[in-house]
Amino acid sequence: MASRSLNGDSDIVKPRKIALVTGITGQDGSYLTEFLLEKGYEVHGLIRRSSNFNTQRLNHIYVDPHNVNKALMKLHYGDLSDASSLRRWLDVIKPDEVYNLAAQSHVAVSFEIPDYTADVVATGALRLLEAVRSHNIDNGRAIKYYQAGSSEMFGSTPPPQSETTPFHPRSPYAASKCAAHWYTVNYREAYGLYACNGILFNHESPRRGENFVTRKITRALGRIKVGLQTKLFLGNIQASRDWGFAGDYVEAMWLMLQQEKPDDYVVATEESHTVKEFLDVSFGYVGLNWKDHVEIDKRYFRPTEVDNLKGDASKAKEMLGWKPKVGFEKLVKMMVDEDLELAKREKVLADAGYMDAQQQP
């Protein structure tokens, strides 16, 4: 849209880019939304209907939609299991970029609900890709598509793992992510879709779900420190992972869609640490010995374990100019600080009689 300036020159007002984000209420979705808003985007997110509000990770950036000039993040009901809703929202929103972050993303849970995991993670990605393809054809558009992959796809393949490393998935979740990865490659090759796979290694933050091991540790640690909890039960503490900061990784997602040609990229810190090392750093940071509080529970071991994941992100560094900013110890301490403050607030409630002092989070 053009406007005339006082000196007679025509000033071109560049329209805002529009992004559609599935999984917007999750850890990655919230950080990506913040990042895109800072870049001047209008961001739309698909959320599933829930009996309880599940948008707490977005509350700090939420603006009442009645304030149309400032509400640049908008939420809509949709689901990767419902193809009609995906196509409908593409037609209504007309996004420039689609980021598919939605998933049943817990590895252990995927063994309990494998059908659902495959339907949402694998077939859900296929539904969204097909919706993008048909929307592009019918409307003469060229949406760019990002598919969230996972280092779990590599499974038992020895590290370091790069874009050329063979996949060997060891869970229904990982197998479903492999399917989504290849659907994305197929739509890129068959239909010329600008579609990228981001193979992200483990990335954490204070917004990480509490049933993931890193947040489970820091959440329990905060409560132990203030006297609300005494024990933490864990599974395989020798498992080694390449842990980075989620806030760093969303930048890599965006960069993939800003290139001349679509491609697939590994995103990782290129450092690997065991769960035991995470315990050492986190408990040591607050002056505690984890051995006094942690017990190993065989129930938390998976039917097939993934022992060591360590990424080779040289391609992302060279082609995207991306590199992680937050190191392992800084990440751990960031998470401990946040969860210690949360535990202190819980302690106030417990002391006032509003919650059971030993109530687990």
Swiss-Prot record:
Biological or metabolic pathway of the protein: Nucleotide-sugar biosynthesis; GDP-L-fucose biosynthesis via de novo pathway; GDP-L-fucose from GDP-alpha-D-mannose: step 1/2
Assembly information from the UniProt record: Homotetramer.
Annotated TM spans: none
EC top class named in words: lyase
A single GO molecular function term of this UniProt record: GDP-mannose 4,6-dehydratase activity
One protein family per Pfam: GDP_Man_Dehyd
InterPro entries associated with the record: GDP_Man_deHydtase, NAD(P)-bd_dom, NAD(P)-bd_dom_sf
UniProt cross-references to CDD domains, sorted A to Z: GDP_MD_SDR_e (cd05260)
Chemical reaction(s) catalysed: GDP-alpha-D-mannose = GDP-4-dehydro-alpha-D-rhamnose + H2O
Gene name linked to the record: GMD1
GO CC, any one term: plastid
Tissue-by-tissue expression: Expressed in roots,stipules and pollen just before anthesis. Primarily localized to the root meristem and columella root cap. Not expressed in emerging lateral roots.
Cofactor(s) needed for function: NADP(+)
Role, per record: Catalyzes the conversion of GDP-D-mannose to GDP-4-dehydro-6-deoxy-D-mannose.
GO terms classed as biological process: 'de novo' GDP-L-fucose biosynthetic process
Entries under HAMAP family matching the protein: GDP_Man_dehydratase (MF_00955)
Gene3D superfamilies per the UniProt record, alphabetical: NAD(P)-binding Rossmann-like Domain, UDP-galactose 4-epimerase, domain 1
Family: Belongs to the NAD(P)-dependent epimerase/dehydratase family. GDP-mannose 4,6-dehydratase subfamily.
Active-site positions on this chain: S150, E152, Y173
Domain of life, per lineage: Eukaryota
The keyword Metal-binding belongs to this UniProt entry's keyword annotation: no
Species per Swiss-Prot/TrEMBL record: Arabidopsis thaliana
Residues noted as binding NADP(+) in the record, renumbered to the chain: 23-28, 79-80, 101-105, 116, 177, 203, 208
Keywords attached to this entry: Lyase, NADP
UniProt name for this protein: GDP-mannose 4,6 dehydratase 1
